[in-house]
C-alpha cells in the first residue's frame, strides 16, 4: 500500500479518523436522539417508535424499521433547498442505504408489530454524511431499544449486532481513511464501507471518479477501512456506556 509522505490538510496521517464526539438527547420527545460529530461533519440522529407496521407486514408478528435522511438548509456553503414533494436521487439512495444497514442488525420478531423510524438530519456537511448517519443512527437505535426494554415495552433486545460505516478513497493515488470534503472532492476513487461487529461486510459503495482502480487497490482500501470501522465500533460502545 502506498502511504502519503505528507500529512493531510488537517494534520492527520492517512490511516487516522477525524475526531469523534456525541451529544446525547438534544430532542426531548424522541425515543432517543443524538448529534454525532466527525470532524466538521455533524448529523442529528433520532429514533421514534410507532405502533403498527406497513400494510404488507401486518399479521406476521414482526416489526419494521425505516430511515429518512436530509441535508438541512444551512448545512452546506450554499443553502440547500428543502426537499418537500420530490426527493433527489442522492437522498433516496442514502436513506435506503441507512435503512438497509440498520435492518441487517435487527431481529424484527423481537419488535413485535412495531415500527422504528430513524431520522438523520445533516447539520453540517464536510463529507462522510452517510457514513456518520449510519454510525450515529446505530447508537441512537441501540439506546432507544434499551429504553423500550426498561419500560417493559419489549421483552428481548432486538439489536443483535453493531454496524458502522466509513469512507476511504484514493487521492493522488494514495489511500486515505475518513475523507473530508477537500479530499473527497479530489478523490479518484471513493468507497463507502459498512461493516458489522463480526467483521462481515454489509455493503460496499465504490466509484471510480477518475481512472479505474485495480483489485489490489480495492484490497488496500478495505484493509485501511477495517481498523477504522473497529475504532468506530469501540466509540459506539463507549458512547452508550457514557450515556448510561
Curated annotation (Swiss-Prot):
Its EC number is 2.7.7.56. It catalyses: tRNA(n+1) + phosphate = tRNA(n) + a ribonucleoside 5'-diphosphate. It holds the Pfam family RNase_PH_C. It comes from the Bacteria. Keywords: Nucleotidyltransferase, RNA-binding, rRNA processing, Transferase, tRNA processing, tRNA-binding. GO terms for molecular function: 3'-5'-RNA exonuclease activity; tRNA binding; tRNA nucleotidyltransferase activity. One of its GO terms (biological process) is rRNA catabolic process. Belongs to the RNase PH family. Homohexameric ring arranged as a trimer of dimers. Phosphorolytic 3'-5' exoribonuclease that plays an important role in tRNA 3'-end maturation. Removes nucleotide residues following the 3'-CCA terminus of tRNAs; can also add nucleotides to the ends of RNA molecules by using nucleoside diphosphates as substrates, but this may not be physiologically important. Probably plays a role in initiation of 16S rRNA degradation (leading to ribosome degradation) during starvation. This is Ribonuclease PH. The lineage of its organism: Bacteria, Bacillati, Cyanobacteriota, Cyanophyceae, Synechococcales.
Amino acid at each position: 500500500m502506498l502511504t502519503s509522505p505528507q500529512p493531510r490538510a488537517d494534520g492527520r496521517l492517512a490511516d487516522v479518523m477525524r475526531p469523534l464526539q456525541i451529544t446525547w438527547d438534544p430532542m426531548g420527545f424522541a425515543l432517543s436522539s443524538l448529534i454525532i460529530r466527525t470532524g466538521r461533519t455533524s448529523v442529528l440522529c433520532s429514533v421514534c417508535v410507532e405502533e403498527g407496521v406497513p400494510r404488507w407486514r401486518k399479521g406476521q408478528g414482526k416489526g419494521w424499521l425505516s430511515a429518512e435522511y436530509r441535508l438541512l438548509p444551512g448545512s452546506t456553503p450554499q443553502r440547500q433547498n428543502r426537499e418537500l414533494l420530490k426527493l433527489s436521487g442522492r437522498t433516496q439512495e442514502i436513506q435506503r442505504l441507512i435503512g438497509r444497514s440498520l435492518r441487517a442488525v435487527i431481529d424484527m420478531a423481537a419488535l413485535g408489530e412495531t415500527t422504528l423510524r430513524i431520522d438523520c438530519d445533516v447539520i453540517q456537511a464536510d463529507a462522510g454524511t452517510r457514513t456518520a448517519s449510519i454510525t450515529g443512527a446505530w447508537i441512537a437505535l441501540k439506546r432507544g431499544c434499551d429504553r423500550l426494554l426498561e419500560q417493559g415495552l419489549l421483552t428481548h433486545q432486538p439489536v443483535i449486532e453493531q454496524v458502522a460505516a466509513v469512507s476511504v478513497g484514493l487521492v493522488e493515488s494514495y489511500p486515505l481513511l475518513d475523507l473530508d470534503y477537500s479530499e473527497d472532492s479530489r478523490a479518484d476513487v471513493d468507497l463507502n464501507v459498512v461493516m458489522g461487529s463480526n467483521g462481515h461486510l454489509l455493503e460496499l459503495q465504490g466509484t471510480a471518479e477518475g481512472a479505474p482502480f485495480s483489485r489490489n487497490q480495492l484490497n488496500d482500501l478495505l484493509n485501511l477501512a477495517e481498523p477504522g470501522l473497529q475504532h468506530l465500533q469501540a466509540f459506539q460502545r463507549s458512547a452508550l456506556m457514557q450515556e448510561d
